[in-house]
Amino acid sequence: MDVTAKYELIGLMAYPIRHSLSPEMQNKALEKAGLSFTYMAFEVDNDSFPGAIEGLKALKMRGTGVSMPNKQLACEYVDELTPAAKLVGAINTIVNDDGYLRGYNTDGTGHIRAIKESGFDIKGKTMVLLGAGGASTAIGAQGAIEGLKEIKLFNRRDEFFDKALAFAQRVNENTDCVVTVTDLADQQAFAEALASADILTNGTKVGMKPLENESLVNDISLLHPGLLVTECVYNPHMTKLLQQAQQAGCKTIDGYGMLLWQGAEQFTLWTGKDFPLEYVKQVMGFGA
């Protein structure tokens, strides 16, 4: 790819960032589509995020992806949020229209799309959701919008717990889905929730390097063959949770599904063009 002065810049703002597959995936898609954009990763944490957004405007970047730890903070720096993004309280995509910034969240739509593409119908189902960060709440919000009956959210009593309670209140007030929040330390409640669940989704970074030998499921007997286990982590591809799930006879969906579908939606938001899905799946080895 020969980058010329006509190219527009799209970024990804996160910390850490060197593990991300998004730059490779998006640049392959942009080149295949013959578009004059290039996608670059920038190490940006909460402290440097405000300045990075000013830089985005000054450089007239087309937009940026937003990942940990900036997804919730980013809501404060855009001019407009989609209804789904308001429900989530976090964004992963910013589109810059001549200095007017719009915030979107494609994490939720991407993950739910991956579930649907596997042939699983979420309507009327119960999900156990691990974590209350930007990705997790995005999945919960989109699942609620698309027909989940109940979401049982488990999170440690950390800085995200109050945010989880606020998220549950927003979803309960604006959708027909019932969301409850429980401390993950309550292992009896966790076991009971899994016993009656249809879906278990890990929306935390547990399982991602350097935590690749960890899982929030301490007892594999809690997993049953009727359970669909889905993962947001894609590095490593086969997390400990997915290994446990397969050993228990569960159907699984790895983190590549969410990465692919959320990225496809981002691509269209930035470029107005269709994402070359099958080509990207092939060259990135997704689903292989």
Curated annotation (Swiss-Prot):
Top enzyme category: oxidoreductase
Pathway: Metabolic intermediate biosynthesis; chorismate biosynthesis; chorismate from D-erythrose 4-phosphate and phosphoenolpyruvate: step 4/7
Chain residues that bind substrate: K71, D107
Record SUPFAM superfamilies: Aminoacid dehydrogenase-like, N-terminal domain, NAD(P)-binding Rossmann-fold domains
Role of this protein: The actual biological function of YdiB remains unclear, nor is it known whether 3-dehydroshikimate or quinate represents the natural substrate. Catalyzes the reversible NAD-dependent reduction of both 3-dehydroshikimate (DHSA) and 3-dehydroquinate to yield shikimate (SA) and quinate, respectively. It can use both NAD or NADP for catalysis, however it has higher catalytic efficiency with NAD.
PANTHER family with a match to the protein in the record: BIFUNCTIONAL 3-DEHYDROQUINATE DEHYDRATASE_SHIKIMATE DEHYDROGENASE, CHLOROPLASTIC, SHIKIMATE DEHYDROGENASE
UniProt xrefs under NCBIfam families: PRK12749.1 (NF009390)
Subunit description: Homodimer.
Protein name per the record: Quinate/shikimate dehydrogenase
Lineage of producing organism: Bacteria, Pseudomonadati, Pseudomonadota, Gammaproteobacteria, Enterobacterales
Gene: ydiB
